[in-house]
From Swiss-Prot:
Signal peptide: none annotated. Keywords: Ribonucleoprotein, Ribosomal protein. NCBIfam families: rpsB_bact. Residues 226-245 are annotated as: Disordered. This is Small ribosomal subunit protein uS2. One of its GO terms (cellular component) is cytosolic small ribosomal subunit. It comes from Erythrobacter litoralis (strain HTCC2594). GO terms for molecular function: structural constituent of ribosome. It holds the Pfam family Ribosomal_S2.
């Protein structure tokens, strides 16, 4: 099946064209800016549509070839959509805090994942012989590891592509991917540096509805059985939200 599509109309309705205030821009985003309105940069969606299609095609081809897709979005608006995108497509995610070395020091991260699974096994079985305080401490340790590593617990190695919401906030993740030669798909607002992004997709990265649109599209692309659908035809369309200029 073909990769999913995102239309100009869907991007407009989601507020994807609203960038940040003009004084907050990154000059390297100039090629993707249409102009300014009321002190806010307007993103050129005539570029976003084909660039989004290119990124979706790449993610779709990677997933179909058995590749691993890692979704990264730790800002508040992205946390839930990112996790849902990964779970619905059978892929992987980081939506809490990027731990230094998550990719470049995978061996250590793997040990922490093993510890998480061991704690889960221990707590799911008989815990008599342990005091209430010991059980509480083990539970807290498990919960902390789950928050950081739960989304990559079954990744089994570094991913084949990374999809990022907000290149500024996830700069450490992008740097690690660049070091390892992992291609990065990035939603780029007008205040970010597009360097290191193999598949740039200019668009608002703050409005909840826009973030949901991107995540839904990439979730379909990353699903081995998905693709081919128009994202706007979903049964539960994203809820409207105001763009944060």
């Amino acid at each position: 099946m073909a990769a999913p599509t995102v239309t100009m109309q869907q991007l407009i309705e989601a507020g994807s064209h609203f960038g940040h205030q003009t004084h907050r821009w990154n000059p390297r985003m100039k090629p993707y800016i249409f102009g300014a309105r009321n002190g806010v940069h307007i993103i050129d969606l005539s570029q976003t549509v084909p660039l989004m299609a290119r990124a979706l095609d790449f993610v779709h081809a990677t997933a179909n070839a058995g590749g691993k897709v890692l979704f990264v979005g730790t800002k508040r608006q992205a946390q839930e959509p990112i996790a849902e995108a990964a779970r619905s497509s059978g892929q992987h995610f980081v939506n809490h805090r990027w731990l230094g070395g998550m990719l470049t020091n995978w061996q250590t991260i793997s040990k922490s994942i093993k510890e998480l699974k061991s704690l889960e096994e221990q707590l799911s079985g008989e815990t008599h012989g342990l005091t209430k305080k010991e059980v509480l401490n083990l539970t807290r340790k498990r919960d902390k590891l789950e928050l950081s590593l739960g989304g990559i617990r079954d990744m089994g190695g570094v991913p084949d592509v990374m999809v990022v919401i907000d290149a500024n906030k996830e700069d450490l993740a992008i740097k690690e991917a660049n070091v390892l030669g992992i291609p990065v798909v990035g939603i780029l607002d007008t205040n970010v540096d597009p360097s290191g992004i193999a598949f740039p997709v200019p668009g608002n990265d703050d409005a909840a509805r826009a973030v949901r649109l991107y995540c839904d599209a990439f979730a379909q692309a990353a699903s081995k059985n998905g693709g081919g659908a128009n994202v706007g035809e979903m049964e539960n369309p994203p809820v409207e939200a105001t763009a944060d200029a």
